[in-house]
């Protein structure tokens, strides 16, 4: 096993860990906001879904870059 494979695995793993933590924080804050102001639920949910989509894009990009790096 080369160091490149190990580096790719660490990059993908840390990207997934960071995304998991960020998604938890995003959803937690959204629930707090909805509990405080229920009338803003549609706006908060839309913002939450956009935020979660952006956060989830980063680990996917990390996996793609890892495959590109390993393919060389």
UniProtKB/Swiss-Prot annotation:
Transmembrane spans: 1-21, 48-68
InterPro entries cross-referenced by the UniProt entry: ATP_synth_csu_bac/chlpt, ATP_synth_F0_csu, ATP_synth_F0_csu_DDCD_BS, ATP_synth_F0_csu_sf, ATPase_proteolipid_c-like_dom, F/V-ATP_Csub_sf
Domain of life per record: Bacteria
Subcellular location: Cell membrane
One Gene Ontology CC term in the entry: proton-transporting two-sector ATPase complex, proton-transporting domain
Cited PROSITE patterns: ATPASE_C
Pfam families tied to this protein: ATP-synt_C (PF00137)
Keywords: ATP synthesis, Cell membrane, CF(0), Hydrogen ion transport, Ion transport, Lipid-binding, Membrane, Transmembrane, Transmembrane helix, Transport
Membrane topology (UniProt): Multi-pass membrane protein
Site residues by UniProt (Reversibly protonated during proton transport): 56
Molecular function in Gene Ontology: lipid binding; proton-transporting ATP synthase activity, rotational mechanism
Family note: Belongs to the ATPase C chain family.
Stated role: F(1)F(0) ATP synthase produces ATP from ADP in the presence of a proton or sodium gradient. F-type ATPases consist of two structural domains, F(1) containing the extramembraneous catalytic core and F(0) containing the membrane proton channel, linked together by a central stalk and a peripheral stalk. During catalysis, ATP synthesis in the catalytic domain of F(1) is coupled via a rotary mechanism of the central stalk subunits to proton translocation.
Family matches, as NCBIfam families: ATP_synt_c, PRK06876.1
Quaternary assembly: F-type ATPases have 2 components, F(1) - the catalytic core - and F(0) - the membrane proton channel. F(1) has five subunits: alpha(3), beta(3), gamma(1), delta(1), epsilon(1). F(0) has three main subunits: a(1), b(2) and c(10-14). The alpha and beta chains form an alternating ring which encloses part of the gamma chain. F(1) is attached to F(0) by a central stalk formed by the gamma and epsilon chains, while a peripheral stalk is formed by the delta and b chains.
Protein name listed in UniProt: ATP synthase subunit c
Native source species: Geobacillus stearothermophilus (Bacillus stearothermophilus)
């Amino acid at each position: 096993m080369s160091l490149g494979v190990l580096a790719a695995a660490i990059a993908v793993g840390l990207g997934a860990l960071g995304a998991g933590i960020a998604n938890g924080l995003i959803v937690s804050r959204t629930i707090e906001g909805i509990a405080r102001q229920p009338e803003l639920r549609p706006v908060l949910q839309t913002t939450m879904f956009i935020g979660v989509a952006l956060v989830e894009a980063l680990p996917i990009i990390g996996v793609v870059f890892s495959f590109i790096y390993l393919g060389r």
